[in-house]
């Protein structure tokens, strides 16, 4: 029986989401017939090496930023997902932006700022988004339509944690997301936040947000274009096995890329498993497919 080291938890602020992803993946891999060994980042190299392959759902710093991938590469262990270089690139939202801009892909106007420069930046004088240059799950992401003193106080606290953050033009439109499995785009999901709020951390995980597939407000030709852009972003940044790219469809039909996630959530309410389900992959089938990709890559490299 193939043994899978399943890494979940970590020390980032996304630990709880990671643990939830881990629980879902553990159940799925077990149902698919694998021996699953659940580990956290404090595991030893020996514990890792006792397994055939690694499946990490470590979200956030230390898990998605290339650090853990570097460790696995040094050990020579096959693992699901993007390599260290691609993980570093996509986790650094500023570097990711520069990569896409250089390739001519559509992305929102933005800049990396610190607390001293943020309030005076031209983009901050209009509706905008402030978010960490690294990180995910919408933690410390602020959507500012009309600046208020309470917003500034909260943002100042975030700058104390992150030092530098990404300031982006707020793009209005229909929010969508597209996953890539292997080299194939998955169906598009349209995200409709509750009328009372945005697609923030709370609404992302409390089940209040509507996630519709197929997207009722996005024409089929625009869905195809979004899938093409997601695949381009996936390939341009060197992603492997899986990724999920978030975008906005504007009223005039233009599609703007927001970001690409190399390690999308795998919880019961996560977007990637939902779009995979529509494509015909239940969780056991999806996780089995991902493990086989990692093992096949290792076999090819050893040949």
Functional labels for PLM-detected ranges:
Residues 1-95, 114-120, 289, 293-301:
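ATP-binding N-terminal substructure of ATP-dependent carboxylate-amine bond-forming enzymes
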Residues 2-8, 36, 45-48, 89-174:
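Active-site nucleotide/adenylate-binding loops and adjacent lid/helix of ATP-dependent enzymes
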Residues 60, 137-138, 194, 261-275:
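Glycine-rich phosphate/pyrophosphate-binding beta-alpha loops
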Residues 113, 141-147, 180-182, 250, ...:
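Short beta-strand-to-turn element immediately C-terminal to the catalytic PLP-Schiff-base lysine
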Residues 149-228, 249-256:
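Phosphate-binding site of ATP-dependent enzymes
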Residues 169, 234-266, 276:
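Conserved metal-phosphate-binding beta-hairpin within the catalytic cores
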Residues 191-243, 274-303:
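Active-site "cap" helix and flanking loop/linker of ATP-utilizing ligase/carboxylase catalytic domains
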């Amino acid at each position: 029986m193939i043994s899978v080291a399943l890494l979940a938890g970590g020390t980032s602020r996304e630990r709880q989401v990671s643990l939830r992803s881990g629980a879902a993946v553990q159940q799925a891999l077990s149902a698919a017939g694998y021996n699953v060994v659940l580990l956290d980042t404090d595991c030893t190299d020996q514990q890792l090496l006792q397994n055939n392959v690694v499946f990490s759902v470590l979200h956030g710093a230390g898990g998605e930023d290339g650090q853990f991938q570097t460790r696995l590469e040094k050990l020579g262990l096959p693992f699901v997902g993007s390599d260290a270089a691609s993980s570093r690139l996509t986790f650094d939202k500023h570097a990711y932006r520069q990569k896409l801009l250089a390739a001519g892909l559509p992305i929102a106007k933005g800049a990396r700022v610190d607390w001293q420069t943020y309030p005076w930046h031209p983009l901050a004088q209009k509706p905008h988004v402030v978010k960490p240059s690294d990180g995910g799950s919408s933690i410390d992401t602020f959507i500012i339509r009309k600046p208020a003193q309470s917003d500034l106080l909260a943002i100042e606290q975030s700058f104390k944690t992150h030092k530098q953050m990404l300031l982006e033009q707020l793009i209005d439109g229909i929010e969508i997301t597209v996953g890539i499995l292997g080299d194939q785009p998955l169906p598009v999901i349209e995200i409709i936040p509750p009328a009372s709020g945005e697609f923030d951390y709370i609404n992302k995980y409390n089940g209040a947000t509507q996630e519709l597939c197929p997207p009722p407000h996005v024409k089929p030709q625009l869905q195809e274009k979004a899938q093409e852009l997601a695949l381009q972003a996936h390939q341009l940044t060197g992603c492997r096995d899986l990724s999920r790219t978030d975008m906005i469809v504007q009223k005039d039909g233009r599609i703007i890329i927001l970001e690409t996630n190399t390690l999308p959530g795998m919880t019961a309410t996560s977007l990637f498993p939902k779009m995979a389900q529509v494509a015909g992959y239940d969780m056991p089938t999806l996780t089995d497919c991902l493990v086989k990709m990692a093992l096949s890559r290792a076999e090819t490299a050893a040949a």
